[in-house]
């Protein structure tokens, strides 16, 4: 069972985040094979460059994101991840982002899910910027974010959703691609206490 502790955390404005699918898959494969432990991800990433980072600083940045996301789930999640195809694994990576980024979780809940429910299949830059501005109005920490930082976070959201197969390739208006969730995925997310996140991905009301 996974605790969605991110709901008690501050809203971050992550300007350099990515889906990191291949990096997360590499780490999970090594953990399940007994070749890596989560606390060692940072050291192994720096010493052996297992994520093929372009620099030491980038290696550290990737390792921090991968560690944060893997720490947010349990061993059952890692094992389930390993059994799924690439498309499902990318969706599971999106779930891991939601579990570690309060801002992204709220965006997916209030914007992406509502689009699915209303059968509005276009995500506009203005939808994402409007979300951030509403967040700034209600949260004093978010109110300090710069416009430049918000635009970078917006672009990161689009990039992650595109890589996960949930958004079309490019443009200020992008077509939303409804995720395909089989019964096994639904049952697993429900059993892990992630019913809310399942409903976000499925475009269902609470």
Spans of model-derived segments:
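Eukaryotic partner-binding/assembly regions in large regulatory complexes
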Residues: 1-91
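Leucine-rich, amphipathic alpha-helical/linker segments
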Residues: 10-17, 30, 97-98, 102-103, ...
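Short runs of predominantly hydrophobic/aromatic residues within well-ordered alpha helices
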Residues: 17-27, 59, 63, 101-108, ...
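Positively charged, polyanion-binding regions of nucleic-acid-associated proteins
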Residues: 92-95, 100-121
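Catalytic DNA-binding helix-loop module of base-excision-repair DNA glycosylases/AP lyases
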Residues: 106-112, 127-132, 160, 164
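Long, low-complexity intrinsically disordered regions
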Residues: 112, 116, 120, 136-145
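DNA-recognition alpha helix
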Residues: 124-140
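Accessory, usually C-terminal, subdomains that scaffold auxiliary metal cofactors
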Residues: 143-206
């Amino acid at each position: 069972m996974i605790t969605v502790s991110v709901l008690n955390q501050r809203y971050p404005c992550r300007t350099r985040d990515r889906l990191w699918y291949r990096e997360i898959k590499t780490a999970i494969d090594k953990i399940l094979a007994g070749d890596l432990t989560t606390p060692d991800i940072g050291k192994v990433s720096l010493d052996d460059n297992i994520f093929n980072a372009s620099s030491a600083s980038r290696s550290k940045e990737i390792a921090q994101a991968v560690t944060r996301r893997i720490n947010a789930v349990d061993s059952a999640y890692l094992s389930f991840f390993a059994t799924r195809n690439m498309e499902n694994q990318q969706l599971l990576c999106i779930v891991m982002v939601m579990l570690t980024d309060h801002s992204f979780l709220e965006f997916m809940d209030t914007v992406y899910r509502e689009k699915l429910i209303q059968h509005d299949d276009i995500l506009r830059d203005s939808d994402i910027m409007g979300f951030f501005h509403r967040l700034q109005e209600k949260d004093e920490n978010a109110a300090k974010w710069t416009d430049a930082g918000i635009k970078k976070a917006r672009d990161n959201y689009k990039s992650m959703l595109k890589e996960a197969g949930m958004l079309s390739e490019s443009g200020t208006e992008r077509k939303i691609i409804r995720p395909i969730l089989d019964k096994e995925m639904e049952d697993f997310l429900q059993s892990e206490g992630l019913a809310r996140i399942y409903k976000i991905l499925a475009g269902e009301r609470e």
